[in-house]
Amino acid sequence: MVKSIQIEQFGGPEVLQYKNIDLPKLNPNEVLVNNKAIGLNFIDVYHRTGVYPIPLPSGIGLEACGVVEEIGSDVTLFNVGDRVSHACMPIGAYAEKQILPGEKLVKVPDGISDEIAASITLKGMTCEYLLHRAYAVKKTDTILFHAAAGGVGQLFCQWAKAIGCTIIGTVGSDEKIEIAKKNGCHHVINYSKENFAKKVMEITNGKGVDAVYDGVGLKTFEGSIESIKIRGTLLTFGNASGVVSSIDPKKHLAPKAIFITRPSVMPYTTIRQELELSASMVFDAILSGKIKVDIFKQYSLEDARKAHEDLASRILTGPSVLIP
């Protein structure tokens, strides 16, 4: 038996249960991973609350780093003792050990700690596809990133700065302005005090930005549309403030011929070669210094409720992990 966080109903942090579970036998294509560190991500809150419904009862968590303890008979990509990380289904990373499809794991290079790998695989690959594939950011671009002081935002802005584009970031408090600037933003707007769309237009001399990266959702959607230039792109990749329930092509898209996409990491890493390329780009960005990662806070696995309280209240201003 192994310790795991399980949920039997959707709700607040109180639905997270720290309990023993039995693991099934390995299928031929599967790997048993002994988790050393587990990533905390806002999508875990969506799964816990039912914003993104999952079958119940269920484990929770999509990201971890650990050591291969056992491999199925058909697994050829890994050996016992390899350090690996993942950011994928099946859900259940909040556990001492987890069984995963071998094709969903990636090797972690020397020079990257378990804690950093666990905190960077999902967020890092999210930044990779947002910057390079969902919309290929160019040096000449001006872009807007919402929640620039958040976990994804800090990594994204560092990486975008290395490309050489101009970055406008939004934050929800004055305390987070310096965090956003430290991580690469050229301009920072506190959207709790200012009309960010109006400010973006001032910064861009009325032109608007080439692309808006919006993981906030409901509260920022209309302003994001206003902030985009003619034939610009809106990448809506999260719903931290609530889900955008409807988009009116005539109202929202037609006036400026805006492109809109709703990307997520899974469709960009479904093919094994894409998964390996994305992970290698993330790890290379860390090892080369393009991205600097400092673990903000560590929690024990049994303190997952407290971790979720902090995650939902937005007091975690950097990558944080659970330690089994």
Where are the regions a protein language model picked out?
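Glycine-rich beta-strand-centered segment in the early N-terminal region that forms part
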Residues: 22-39, 49-92
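NAD(P)H dinucleotide-binding glycine-rich loop of Rossmann-like/cofactor-binding domains
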Residues: 46, 86-147, 159
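Mid-domain Rossmann-like dinucleotide-binding core that forms the NAD(H)/NADP(H) cofactor-binding site
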Residues: 120-193
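Glycine-rich phosphate-binding loop and adjacent beta-alpha segment
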Residues: 163, 171, 219-291, 324
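Short amphipathic alpha-helix with an adjacent loop that forms part of the alpha/beta core around
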Residues: 196-206
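C-terminal capping/lid region of NAD(P)-dependent oxidoreductase domains
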Residues: 258, 290-297, 305-324
